[in-house]
């Protein structure tokens, strides 16, 4: 049905003679649901800060700009779409207008280009119910993640644990290198704290008294 729906959209654009002047963007806001499918070789699923929860496909068709069949390896994030579409539409940013993302137009024109961005950030200071290997009752507990180059750091706010992964060598995030790479942990954590301060991102000020990492989610019965 997804293929049919995308085809219907493109057919309508062709019928209205708008297909040569329309940008089509296809993406997901999160990874696949673990109970329905497998995200292998990625770890985790929808609602988690592991790659299985935040890495998803992105396909862009921009007639006359993007090269059909080209592949770009530059990591991007959802907040990049707003500045991208502003630039594509020729909309000038207001003076002093601060945006979280960056325009992807350079990448759409040249898939081999790179963005001048030091890090990508994810911030989730809340609980999401559901079983995981790390927690029996929560798919996600309050946490944040940062990616700088091939390195990724995850901070769990409840217990302060830090997990470090090299995504180039360990895309499945099986080997936590935090103990072996303390200087890299320090570097990424400092960048994370700096971003958090600049954006005034909310962080839990105290632990949830009802939080129990050993708790197990009990399935609800049907009425």
Give a label for each model feature:
Residues 1-8, 37, 80, 84, ...:
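Extracytoplasmic/secreted proteins, especially bacterial periplasmic and envelope-associated proteins
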Residues 6, 13, 23-28, 58-59, ...:
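Beta-strand elements within well-structured catalytic alpha/beta cores of enzymes
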Residues 10-13, 17, 31, 63, ...:
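A generic secondary-structure signal for well-formed alpha-helical elements
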Residues 11-65, 77, 137, 222-223:
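Histidine-centered active-site microenvironments of extracellular/periplasmic hydrolases
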Residues 18-24, 115-117, 149-151, 184:
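Loop/turn elements at helix/coil->beta-strand transitions in domains of secreted/extracellular proteins
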Residues 20-21, 93-96, 202-206:
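Surface-exposed patches in mature extracellular/periplasmic domains of secreted proteins
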Residues 31-38, 44-49, 66-70, 74, ...:
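C-terminal cap/loop subdomain of S1 sulfatases and analogous C-terminal strand-loop tails that border
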Residues 81, 127, 148, 158-161, ...:
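Long, internal low-complexity/basic segments
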């Amino acid at each position: 049905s997804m293929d049919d729906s995308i085809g219907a959209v493109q057919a309508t654009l062709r019928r209205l003679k708008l297909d040569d002047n329309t940008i089509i963007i296809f993406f997901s806001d999160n990874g696949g649901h673990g109970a329905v499918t497998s995200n292998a070789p990625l770890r985790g699923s929808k609602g988690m800060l592991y790659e299985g929860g935040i890495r998803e496909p992105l396909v862009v068709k921009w007639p006359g700009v993007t090269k059909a069949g080209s592949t770009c390896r530059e990591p991007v994030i959802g907040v990049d779409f707003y500045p991208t579409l502003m630039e594509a539409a020729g909309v000038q940013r207001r003076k002093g207008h601060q945006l979280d993302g960056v325009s992807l137009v350079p990448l759409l024109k040249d898939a081999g280009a790179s963005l001048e961005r030091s890090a990508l950030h994810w911030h989730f200071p809340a609980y999401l119910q559901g079983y995981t290997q790390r927690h029996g009752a929560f798919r996600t507990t309050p946490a944040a993640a940062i990616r700088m180059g091939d390195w990724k750091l995850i901070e769990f706010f409840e217990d302060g644990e830090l997990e470090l992964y090299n995504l180039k060598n360990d895309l499945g995030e099986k080997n936590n290198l935090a103990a072996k790479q303390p200087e890299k942990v320090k570097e990424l954590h400092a960048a994370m704290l700096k971003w958090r301060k600049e954006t005034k991102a909310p962080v839990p000020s105290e632990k949830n008294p009802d939080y129990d990492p050993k708790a197990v989610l009990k399935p609800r019965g049907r009425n």
